[in-house]
Amino acid sequence: FRSHKLPVDAFIFDFEWYTTTPDYTVAREGKEGYSDFNFNPKLFPHPAKQIADLKAAGVKFIGIRKPRLGNNLLLNTARKNGWLSHPDSDSRDLNFSSAKLRQWFENKTKPMLQAGVDAWWDDEGESYYTCYYWWNTAQYHLLNDVRPNYRHFTINRAFSPGNQRFGYCTWNGDIQSSWASLADVPKDLLNFSLAGMYYGACDIGGFHGTPEKETLVRWFQAGVFFPIMRAHSDLGTTARFPFLWGEDGEAAMRKALELRYQLLPYTYSLAHEAYNT
């Protein structure tokens, strides 16, 4: 990014940052040795130093989290303590409305923040209505403990009333890489705003599939005016990095990003006003 003169402020890491495999096929009782609260040693053998190097380059580290456990021993502890949201099902989701569970979760998560993680991408927490609220409550409390006066931020796939207090962003889910999806994004973000969620976002370029170059360029241009501008895509598609889309595509996306940064005093002021009112 720097060598191509493309501004970037954060890398948002998917599950590979803490585990080698996703947990979608993990059984009800969990998997032996599954990593829920550690860095993936293949990608981050020296996490504190690697994150410090990112920060020295002006880049924040944001990591995805899931509202469930994959490790069999941790799952057994949670099940014995009544900390699962649907204990009689195959679900491994945690019941974050439990104060004791939140304290346990904070203790498990704390080393990640101490290693330098800046913020969280909370995904797949739709199993019960207040999951995202209580989940963010735990994360907010922990961040204030580890880094007092540090501004909390999470990006989430859904929201409920009251989440605005957490520096909380909602994105509109795993959408298609199509012109129709691009056209829907402004409507989605306006609906979020009308419901009180002023930090809205989408996957720039869409999540599923690979967009046409012009579609991606137009998406970057539209994203200049979104509250949060974040590119993301599914595995097996062409990443939305501008330098992968030819010189003309890169130049157009760079120009859009530069406009985004020129507008930051304006958008930052609006964010401050929204928070205070």
Positions of predicted regions on the chain:
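Catalytic-domain carbohydrate-binding cleft regions of carbohydrate-active enzymes
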Residues: 2-277
